[in-house]
Amino acid sequence: MTDSQQPGAATEQPKTEFALQKFYLKDVSLECPRSPQVFTGEWKPETNVQLNSQARPLDDQGLFEVELTLTVTTKSGGEVAYLVEVKQAGVFLARGFPKEQMGHLLAAYCPTTLFPFAREAVTDLVSKAGFPQMLLAPVNFDALYAQQLAQNHAGKAGEESAPAGASH
């Protein structure tokens, strides 16, 4: 028997597992406060898109729910034409990963997986409400995650550089 075949060998790596168990539409809302008047005027859309994601453990066996919230507000002529909010969620199995990798999986990889489904729901709702097709650009969740880490790191560095007991 070689060292790698012996039970409890020091070289054993923890087994990592990652899988999408289920994805689902958790909540959806569409508001068209100016219908039908909005369809009679000139269409000059100004769109604001907001993204938010959160993850929470479902058990101690590595199941997590990741929820991606996509809020799209479109104004025309300075007034809200429509507001769509979609909460796309998924149950993911993620275990055996180091803390740093787990953070990336839950905050970047999982939302990347969920985004196409949320985008499709928004597009479908906007179209069914009678508005021109809404095409949302892809989102780089890896870059957003890296930006958040950098902001958190900068915030901690700023706190550490201030002398204890100092007031401003």
Curated annotation (Swiss-Prot):
One of its GO terms (cellular component) is cytoplasm. Keywords: Chaperone, Cytoplasm, Protein transport, Translocation, Transport. One of its GO terms (biological process) is protein transport. It comes from the Bacteria. Gene3D superfamilies: SecB-like. It holds the Pfam family SecB. Its main location: cytoplasm. One of its GO terms (molecular function) is unfolded protein binding. The keyword Cytoplasm applies. Homotetramer, a dimer of dimers. One homotetramer interacts with 1 SecA dimer. One of the proteins required for the normal export of preproteins out of the cell cytoplasm. It is a molecular chaperone that binds to a subset of precursor proteins, maintaining them in a translocation-competent state. It also specifically binds to its receptor SecA. This is Protein-export protein SecB. It comes from Thioalkalivibrio sulfidiphilus (strain HL-EbGR7).
